[in-house]
């Protein structure tokens, strides 16, 4: 990790030996990493659910790898600890039925399904959508454009989903019920 930080920012290496112990919560760890400008590791775990203090984390890590528990607070093991934290969060969220996401923008997009927020509006008719890609596809209704054209029979479609269903006719594939 020292070499990695040296390659990215030589001024941070001299501070590696002086790092304070890891904070007590994951929120604190995230803040801890942000304060030290470790941009490469701050996004390792961005959970919706934050577990109990590091006592549980130490127990979790011990169950998986007993050699890492004694080193949890050492700066050289922060990155590996964060990987264990990510695994801990994903497992905990799955147990509690909490949805987790790969991309940082995904929770915000997913929230729209619950709030009913539809920020993308058609200028022609005012119909609103949750995603800009859906609006782009919808706009073809007003223009008369049918971007999906079958090369075998020449039939054209506004929606890619309709086109994909149509392709099954030519392939002989049975429809999905």
From Swiss-Prot:
SMART domains xref list: ZnF_C2H2
Q: Which PROSITE patterns match?
A: ZINC_FINGER_C2H2_1, ZINC_FINGER_C2H2_2
Query: What molecular functions are annotated in GO for this chain?
Result: DNA binding; DNA-binding transcription factor activity; zinc ion binding
Query: What superkingdom does the record give?
Result: Eukaryota
What keywords would UniProt list here? DNA-binding, Metal-binding, Nucleus, Repeat, Transcription, Transcription regulation, Zinc, Zinc-finger
Look up the signal peptide feature and give its range: none
State where it is primarily located.
nucleus
Where in or outside the cell is it found?
A: Nucleus
GO CC term (a single one): nucleus
**What are the residue ranges of zinc fingers typed C2H2-type?**
99-114, 120-142, 148-170
Q: Which Pfam families match?
A: zf-C2H2 (PF00096)
Q: Which InterPro entries match?
A: Sp4-like, Znf_C2H2_sf, Znf_C2H2_type
Function description? May be involved in transcriptional regulation.
Task: Please identify the protein, giving its name as recorded.
Answer: Putative zinc finger protein 826
Question: Which species does the entry assign this protein to?
Answer: Homo sapiens (Human)
